[in-house]
A protein has these predicted regions:
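Blade/loop signatures of beta-propeller domains
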Residues: 48-74
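Per-blade loop-tip surfaces of WD-repeat and WD-like beta-propellers in eukaryotic adaptors/scaffolds
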Residues: 67-77, 112-127, 152-177, 184, ...
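Canonical WD40 repeat/beta-propeller blade segments in eukaryotic WD-repeat proteins
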Residues: 87-93, 132-140, 184-192, 226-233, ...
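Residue-level detector of Asp-centered blade-edge/turn motifs that repeat once per structural unit
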Residues: 96-97, 142-143, 194-195, 235-236, ...
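Conserved strand-to-loop turn within each blade of WD40 beta-propeller repeats
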Residues: 104-107, 150-154, 202-205, 243-246, ...
């Protein structure tokens, strides 16, 4: 009985093995047939290259169209559109020697542009990579041989040295260590004093920190403005200022001894006159003028060339209505002749003396403008908002300088002075005519 059962089991196993073998052979034949059919279909498609190929091209074209179109913009004063970033540009800064423009974006790079290429067809730039992070703010050092950045994720300052190569370009080397993390709220701005003696950083929680160049905190300032919306160092290197929820701008002097050692931070003066919080402010190149833009719908121009230690207050020179919003930025041309204010995607340019609206630049960027600046010679206005940087001719500046020289000509009594002014007026008018006649970017 047991022998019969064993024989039956053996036969059953043998039958199963045969069935499995047949199934494997059958599957191999099916796979071979499928591969041959696929090869034939591919050959036919390659030979025909007809409807299928066209359909594929149409699908590719359709996928390209589905991508958001790049924002197009043109204007008679547009000198150039600097394109190189693959992410949105968040900050701009000109070097003090006027040769370079730095830009940072959320694409983990800082780009260095040559200002002499602004009017050229091609705009080359040098790229500094921000490892494992991206910079939201960038500022040149006074000697134009380094720049500092604020790291978005690291919440710290990182210094980059610019090392000049034999071909005239630069390589970039980050400092071995970042500054320590000290701020407890979002950063609104950073800056380096033109004297090279200190670095400033300011956050929304009313804190301003004064650092030495090695990353040690020299002083902490509480602005008592409920929130800080903006802060900056003055071009002269003596002052730091802030604005925020309160309707004033507060200015402090950072004091150093004769030997260069830090002494103290003292309150210098306030700009009082707005009826609502101040969005932003800017200095002229000599720090003798300041401009403020407020939620009250006005901008104000101030004479800040005062002896504040003798309790002399700044003089209000003018109040002008304007359109602004929480993200508005303001720039004052280095010569103090033109005020530029951003509002959303638009820019308005005013004559600083008369308050007249000279130019309205609408739809400059596809997103809210993040920064706006004049170059050190007051020839160009640059702004950022999306992936591009717009460069505009400062036509209002040319007009204002011509007007100023014409006023001087009326008062001139010396013949040599008159001839010199007449020549300068002709040159300025010729430059303006060239700008207005130039083809747009």
């Amino acid at each position: 009985m047991e022998v019969a059962a064993l024989v039956a089991l053996t036969l059953l196993l043998g039958a199963l093995v045969i069935l499995v073998a047949l199934a494997v052979v059958r599957r191999k034949e099916e796979i071979k047939e499928e591969s041959e059919q696929a090869a034939e279909s591919s050959a036919e498609a390659s030979a025909a290259k007809g409807p299928t190929s066209k359909k594929q091209k149409q699908e590719k074209q359709r996928s390209r169209k589905d991508k958001p179109a790049q924002h197009s913009f043109s204007h008679p004063l547009l000198a150039a559109s600097l394109k190189g970033h693959s992410g949105n540009v968040t900050c701009l800064d000109f070097s003090s020697n006027g040769k370079y423009l730095a830009s940072c974006a959320d694409d983990r790079t800082v780009r260095i542009w040559s200002t002499k290429d602004f009017l050229e067809r091609e705009h080359k730039c040098l790229r500094a990579n921000v490892e494992l992070d991206h910079a939201t703010l960038v500022r040149f050092s006074p000697d134009s041989r380094a720049f500092i950045t604020w790291l978005s994720n690291g919440d710290a300052i990182r210094i980059f040295k610019m090392i000049k190569k034999d071909d005239g370009t630069f390589s970039f080397k980050a400092a071995s260590e970042d500054f320590p993390q000290k701020h407890k709220a979002a950063i609104v701005n950073i800056g380096i004093a033109e004297t090279g003696k200190f670095i400033m950083s300011a956050s929304t929680d009313t804190t301003i920190l004064i650092w030495d160049l090695k990353g040690e905190v020299l002083a902490s300032i509480n602005t008592n403005q409920m929130t800080n919306s903006y802060a900056a160092t003055s071009p002269c290197g003596r002052f730091v200022a802030s604005c925020g929820f309160t309707p004033d701008v507060k200015v402090w002097e950072v004091c150093f001894g004769k030997g260069g050692e830090f002494r103290e931070v003292t309150r210098a003066f306030d700009l009082k006159g707005h009826s609502a919080g101040v969005h932003a402010f800017a200095f002229s190149n000599d720090s003798h003028r300041m401009v403020t833009v407020s939620k009250d719908g006005t901008w104000k121009l101030w004479n800040t060339n005062v002896e504040y230690k003798k309790q002399q207050d700044p003089y209000l020179l003018g109040t002008v209505p304007c359109s602004s919003s929480d993200g508005s930025r303001v720039a004052l041309s280095p010569d103090g002749r033109v005020v530029a204010i951003s509002d959303g995607c638009n820019v308005a340019m005013f004559d600083a003396t008369t308050g007249n609206l000279e130019e309205e630049l609408r739809g400059v960027h596809s997103e809210e403008i993040t920064d706006i600046r004049f170059d050190i010679n007051s020839r160009f206005l640059v702004c950022s908002g999306d992936k591009a940087i717009r460069v505009f001719h400062n036509a209002p500046g040319y007009r204002a300088s011509i007007r100023d020289m014409q006023d001087m000509l009326k008062k001139a009594q010396n013949e040599a002075m008159k001839q010199r002014l007449q020549q300068q007026i002709r040159e300025a008018q010729s430059a303006l005519d060239t700008v207005l006649a130039a083809p747009t970017e």
